[in-house]
Design a protein with these regions (language model features):
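Generic helix N-cap/helix-start motif at coil->alpha-helix transitions
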Residues: 1-10, 40-44, 87-94, 124-133, ...
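Non-membrane alpha-helical segments in proteins
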Residues: 7-15, 28-31, 40-58, 84-100, ...
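Residue-level recognition of tetratricopeptide repeat
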Residues: 51, 137, 175, 214, ...
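Solenoid-like repeat scaffolds
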Residues: 31-39, 70-79, 117-126, 152-164, ...
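Solenoidal tandem-repeat scaffolds enriched in leucines and small polar residues
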Residues: 115-188, 195-196, 206
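C-terminal non-catalytic interaction modules
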Residues: 270-363
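Active-site/pore-lining binding-face segments in mid-to-C-terminal subdomains
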Residues: 224-310
Length: 363
């Protein structure tokens, strides 16, 4: 090992660094491993970076390091030992997963990338179930019927070491049943999660709560969404990764406890500006518009602390609510238009229209 590179020191730095400061530390570890041509750690730290981006930060940031990982791994396929193939498939999965959330990547490019990913799946005979979920989650915005057919392929395919946890899989099933308005099927899938008879990972039961909130709010039934929002508000605001969960809480709490919605908005604004993941941004900004639109009916201004890079930032942090409402509308509409242009559908704009409707049932 090169004397200028101490992997143990870097691992300790990474382990003891929390929050948004961790990603730059891992990048510096990658840079030094590259300089010293420590190929094991060039790969290992890239894997750590992709994992951190995927589960605690901005998922698309996993993509560049995953491509670099692929290049290095193909040159040095044995350096990671017997687990190398699994790490390779996993990091490429983390690179494929965010594409659905990046409207600037054309559908045809996604098709090419998912085909290459499937070749990797077959090469190592790992991740077949996950492959079908990747296909499914993209087609949700293109063709709901085909998306559900792909989900059925996913559900019937055997699990392996690449699979999400069983609770995540059930959350995926809940989402797909709600997508086709099969509330009874979703509720059946949700039973062991609601009774807490399953192990929970970083994203569960958050995914279930978010999808039920969105489903009921889209139906105009804030009363039915309320218990899920109260559950989610206590768990879903840890970091950038949670912006979609925060958006769901804001949207529902607007009609029950707008002060809580404002607290979530203020916290999330620190994370959402400049984020690569456009779906996280859409979910958050959509609900920010809902909140401002609702508040504009009863007051003209609002005091809220905004980050320095907010487009309408002023020294007093007192804002005209209609100005905020218009700003969020323009932001959401721009994101929705970009997704729909890429997907060749109107699913995002139709989703925004549902959010713009006042709930019919509140209490």
């Amino acid at each position: 090992m090169a004397k200028n590179f101490d992997a143990g020191v870097w691992q300790q730095k990474i382990d003891t660094t929390q929050g948004s400061k961790k990603m730059p530390v891992i990048l510096e570890a990658i840079r030094q491993a590259d300089e010293e041509e420590e190929h094991y750690y060039r790969l290992f730290f890239r894997y750590l970076y992709a994992y951190e981006a995927t589960f605690h930060d901005d998922p698309p940031k996993a993509m560049p390091v995953a491509i670099e990982f692929s290049t290095i791994f193909e040159q040095y396929p044995d350096v990671l030992g017997p687990d190398g193939g699994e790490m390779y498939v996993m990091i490429m999965q983390m690179a494929i997963d965010p594409i659905v959330s990046l409207p600037q990547i054309p559908f045809e490019q996604w098709q090419g990338m998912i085909e290459q990913y499937y070749k990797l799946v077959k090469r190592y005979n790992l991740g077949h179930r996950t492959y079908w979920w990747q296909m499914c989650q993209f087609y949700v915005y293109l063709d709901k019927k085909k998306a559900y057919e792909l989900f059925e392929r996913f559900w019937k395919t055997g699990r392996d070491s690449m699979s999400d946890c069983r609770t995540c899989d059930r959350c995926h099933a809940i989402r797909m049943h709600l997508l086709i308005d099969d509330e009874e099927g979703a509720n059946e899938m949700a039973k062991p999660i609601k009774s807490r008879r399953m192990w929970f990972c970083h994203d569960t039961p958050h995914l279930m709560h978010r999808d039920y909130i969105e489903y009921y709010m889209n139906k105009g039934n804030a009363k039915a969404a309320k218990p899920y929002a109260y559950e989610l508000k206590g768990m879903g605001h840890r970091d950038k990764h949670d912006l979609s969960y925060m958006g769901a809480v804001i949207r529902c709490m607007t009609y029950f406890e707008p002060q809580i919605a404002l607290q979530f908005l203020e916290q999330g604004m620190e994370w959402v500006i400049g984020i690569w993941d456009c779906k996280l941004a859409y979910d958050f900004y959509k609900s920010a518009w809902v909140l401002m639109h609702h508040l504009s009916k009863t007051q003209e201004t609002i005091s809220i602390k905004m980050p320095p890079n907010f487009a309408l930032k002023n020294d007093s942090d007192i804002y005209n609510i209609v100005d905020l409402e218009n700003h969020y509308y323009d932001t959401v509409k721009s994101i929705a238009d970009s997704f729909d242009a890429r997907n060749g559908t109107d699913s995002y704009n139709e989703n925004f229209k549902l959010a713009m409707m006042e709930p019919k049932i509140i209490e």
